């Protein structure tokens, strides 16, 4: 757990710098690295109460196949077989969603959009 924790703390600083400097591909690569670290070192893509359930690992592998390096995915949230967060280019969102729902069922994939201005401070 410590390997992931300290590695991810370093990645966060690098992610912030990459976004400030307009290096979005570097940001995505660090998102992928963080997710891979979470998978390997936290082993949080499955529940220890039900090891036969491998949907998260399958979903991450399927994401790699669909995205073919054009986007990234990672385990996200509380872990323990929770959610996949995927950064998918607009031109393949429909393909990604269809493929994921063909495997995991209708409404398994939710498309979110980030507004142009991102987060803002509210006084």
Regions from the language model: what does each represent?
Residues 1-74, 85-123:
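C-terminal nucleotide
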Residues 76-82:
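Short Gly/Ser/Thr- and Asp/Glu-enriched loop/turn motifs at secondary-structure junctions
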């Amino acid at each position: 757990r410590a390997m992931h924790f300290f590695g991810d703390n370093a990645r966060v600083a690098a992610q912030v710098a990459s976004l400030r400097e307009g290096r979005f591909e570097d940001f995505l690569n660090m998102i992928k690295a963080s997710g891979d670290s979470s998978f390997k070192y936290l082993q949080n893509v499955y529940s220890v109460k039900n090891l036969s359930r491998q949907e998260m690992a399958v979903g991450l592998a399927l994401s790699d196949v669909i995205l073919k390096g054009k986007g990234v995915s990672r385990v996200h949230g509380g872990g323990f077989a929770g959610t996949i967060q995927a950064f998918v280019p607009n031109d393949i969102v429909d393909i990604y969603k269809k493929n994921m729902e063909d495997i995991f069922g209708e409404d398994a994939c939710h498309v979110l959009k980030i507004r142009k201005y991102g987060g803002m401070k509210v006084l």
